[in-house]
Regions:
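Terminal amphipathic alpha-helical/low-complexity segments used for targeting or macromolecular assembly
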Residues: 1-5, 10-11, 16-17, 53, ...
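Structural signal for interior beta-strand "rungs" in well-ordered beta-sheet cores
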Residues: 1-182, 186-187
Length: 256
């Protein structure tokens, strides 16, 4: 069903059983998959490819030009997976040619009211972005991450899978997998034990991750000192391997 007040470009590709409510605008080069719902006043622009079963609440702006002064009108892209929910007033921008020209959103994510995801971000699956989260350009977010309300993430930061930020957190460095941070100075607060339990991690795996956390944050080690210890632990603990590899590959440095 497409409401008569909505404007749909002739070049847009609209899938089966898509519901487009009043006063929506679908621009050129947009592709919307089957069973999506645009409630009302939703704008989708640019080279935006949207998967199946996504729901966009009113006043979402999807695939708009990036907020980067270097942007000069180049063709850039947005890809969104399946089964995502974008609540009221979410903004998701396309990429830039300075990166890979692509912003990519995975599947089964929940973007609560007024979330902003900037150009060139890569977001995985099953994440929750609480109200008023702002994610700056080039940020990479793993899977099953929870960003508390009003979290702000600096450009180029990476946030590992299963991480958690408290409400109002300001993230200026990389957040390793499993780690919780809070406050305006992104202070580590331990591992996301409750979240790991809910996701089926065994008690022994959680204990191994806790031991690895202590190596990084509680034993007085620098990152360089912690890495050999983590690598040794990772030989028998796959979940610690994920943590060790993340820390080793961090370009901005990890939260401390």
């Amino acid at each position: 069903m497409i409401h008569s007040s909505s404007v749909i470009s002739e070049s847009a590709i609209i899938g089966k059983n898509v519901q487009i409510g009043p006063f929506c605008i679908i621009g050129d080069n947009v592709e919307i998959g089957d069973n999506c719902v645009l409630t009302s006043h939703v704008i989708v622009k640019g080279h935006s490819k949207i998967g199946k079963n996504n729901v966009f609440f009113q006043f979402c702006s999807i695939g708009e030009d990036c907020q980067d002064k270097k942007y000069a009108g180049e063709a850039t892209y947005l890809e969104i997976g399946d089964d995502n929910v974008f609540r009221e007033s979410c903004t998701i921008h396309r990429g830039t040619v300075q990166d890979e020209s692509m912003t990519r959103i995975g599947s089964r994510n929940l973007f609560m009211v007024n979330t902003h995801v900037a150009h060139d971000c890569i977001c995985g699956d099953d994440n929750i972005f609480a109200n008023n989260c702002t994610v700056a350009g080039h940020v990479h977010i793993g899977n099953q991450v929870i960003l508390g309300g009003l979290t702000a993430v600096h450009q180029f930061c990476h946030i590992g899978s299963h991480a958690f930020t408290g409400g109002g957190a300001i993230v200026l460095k990389d957040v390793p997998p499993y780690v919780m941070v809070s406050g305006t100075k992104h202070i580590p607060q331990g591992i996301n034990s409750e979240g790991l339990k809910r996701r089926g991690f065994t008690s022994s795996s959680i204990m191994a991750i806790k031991r690895a956390y202590k190596v990084i944050y509680r034993n007085g080690n620098t990152t360089d000192q912690a890495l050999p210890i983590l690598n040794e632990m990772a030989e028998t603990e796959p979940d610690v391997r994920i943590l060790a590899d993340f820390v080793a590959s961090s370009k901005r440095g990890i939260v401390r």
